[in-house]
Structures are given as structure tokens and as C-alpha cells.
């Protein structure tokens, strides 16, 4: 029987995507499904759908945002995701790190790149919009930041991210 393949469209700037990333291995083990990670630009997707992020859309509704935070905390507690921290730099411009994800696919270091960037963003509270911080975090994880950042500037990589987003 052919396993179910689930496309996981993600942007590192979404705390919900981080939380999903953390439980995907268990979901895969429980169901036999395979998860295909697809880097996108969430802000671009919101624009294409003529929509806004929940933080922006519900900024004037304090109870809605408070409830969202409460539900997120319930999820974190239920799944034992104690490393999760709200990033003080949120919302973060993720263009560099999302292009980096496509570059990491091309360079065959995608899984480690994804784990590193998610941990940097949502566990270590790093400003992952800053290219110097990005390079330092990748280097600390044993990844070749120079190769990833250089590859992320290639027209093919930029085009793939846009295609993924559409």
C-alpha cells in the first residue's frame, strides 16, 4: 500500500508551524504518513489570499489573541514542548531563512537546516531576520552558512520559493 504523503507548507515565522514541526515525527510514526516539507512565504500567501495574519487581523480584539495564546499553551503543555519560547523579535521577516530552506534542499542539508532554524527562532529567541545571526546559528550547528546563504541568492532558489508560495 502506498503511504499517504502530506504536504506541510511552512514558514519559520509561524509559531504554529514550529509546533507542528515538533509533533510531525510522532504523527508520522503513528500513521505511517510521510510528510513533505514545502517552504513558502506566509506573508506572500496571505497577500495572495487577500488575507492578513491573525496577529494583524485580530490586533483590536484582545480576547481573541488571549484565547489563541491560551490554546497555544495548552498544545505546548499537552505535547511537552517545554523548549518553546515566544520570540521577542516576532513578527520576523523570514525572506532570508525561507530562501535558505530552499537552498538547503538543493545542498542536501534540509532536515538539519530546518531543525536549526526552528530552534533558533522558537527556542533560543534569536533574531532570524538578521543575516549575521542566521550565519552564526547555522555555523554553530555545523552547517555551511556561506554556501547556504550564497545559494539562497540564486535566481533558481528565489523562483522556487515564489512558486511554492503560489
Region annotations inferred by a language model:
Residues 2-34, 38, 102, 109-112, ...:
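C-terminal cap of thioredoxin/glutaredoxin-like
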Residues 19-121:
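Structural alpha/beta surface segment adjacent to cysteine/selenocysteine redox centers
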Amino acid at each position: 500500500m502506498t503511504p499517504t504523503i502530506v504536504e506541510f507548507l511552512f514558514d519559520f515565522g509561524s509559531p504554529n508551524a514550529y509546533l507542528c514541526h515538533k509533533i510531525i515525527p510522532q504523527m508520522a510514526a503513528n500513521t505511517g504518513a510521510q510528510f513533505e516539507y514545502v517552504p513558502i512565504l506566509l506573508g506572500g500567501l496571505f497577500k495572495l489570499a487577500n488575507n492578513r495574519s491573525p496577529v494583524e487581523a485580530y490586533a483590536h480584539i484582545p480576547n481573541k489573541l488571549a484565547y489563541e495564546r491560551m490554546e497555544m499553551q495548552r498544545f505546548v503543555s499537552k505535547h511537552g514542548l517545554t523548549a518553546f519560547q515566544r520570540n521577542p523579535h516576532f513578527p520576523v521577516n523570514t525572506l532570508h531563512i525561507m530562501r535558505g530552506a530552499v537552498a538547503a534542499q538543493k545542498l542536501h542539508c534540509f532536515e538539519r537546516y530546518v531543525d536549526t532554524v526552528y530552534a533558533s527562532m522558537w527556542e533560543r529567541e534569536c533574531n532570524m531576520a538578521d543575516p549575521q545571526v542566521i550565519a552564526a546559528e547555522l555555523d554553530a550547528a555545523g552547517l555551511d552558512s556561506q554556501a547556504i546563504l550564497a545559494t539562497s541568492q540564486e535566481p533558481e532558489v528565489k523562483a522556487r520559493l515564489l512558486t511554492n508560495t503560489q
